[in-house]
A protein has these predicted regions:
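Structured binding/interaction patches within domain cores
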Residues: 1-131, 145
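Charge-dense, extended regions
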Residues: 121-125, 129-165
Length: 165
């Protein structure tokens, strides 16, 4: 599974808009820092190790996205689902870019179903959240709408956002 710049750009934009929906401040700050790190990893000359990204998703210290997802009873689980799936996809991409042959089990299982789960969760979130729709309406998706990969996975979602404006 390969990603292109437009696809990753869209994932970034959609996911960053979910941070405000996380209730506990500690979790919100951790996710924001993690997303910034993920963005840095996508830069052309990035020296960020895929293992560092993966440790933000899952680690033995239990200060990671998957643990917070389990512990947080206030935040909509769909928000956490999107964030965890985004991070798994970014980790997968980072490992692929590095040429790593052996992946952590969680990352090894990343496939098109991960993308589909992300899109499905996001659709459910925008169905019930006008504030999120307004935030997304302010973003310019025009430059990436003609990308076949973006259209394949996100065409319906982007149409829903447009219709709700």
């Amino acid at each position: 599974m390969k990603f292109n710049g437009s696809f990753l750009y869209l994932l970034q934009k959609l996911t960053f808009n979910l941070v405000d929906l996380i209730s506990p401040l500690e979790y919100k700050e951790f996710v924001l820092d993690s997303l910034k790190l993920a963005n840095q990893s996508l830069e052309q000359d990035s020296k960020i190790c895929p293992d560092l990204l993966y440790s933000r998703l899952e680690n033995v210290d239990e200060k990671d996205i998957l643990t917070f997802m389990e512990l947080d009873k206030e935040t909509n689980p769909l928000v956490w689902s999107c964030i965890a799936n985004y991070f798994a996809l970014i980790c997968y991409h980072s490992y692929q870019q590095s040429g790593e042959k052996y992946l952590p089990q969680t990352i090894e299982s990343v496939d098109e179903g991960t993308i589909e789960a992300y899109v499905s969760s996001y659709k459910q979130l925008i169905a019930d959240n006008n504030q999120l729709v307004q935030q997304l309406s302010a973003l310019d998706f025009e430059p990436i709408l003609n990308d076949p990969l973006v259209d394949n996975y996100f065409g319906d979602l982007l149409q829903e956002i447009k219709l709700k404006q």
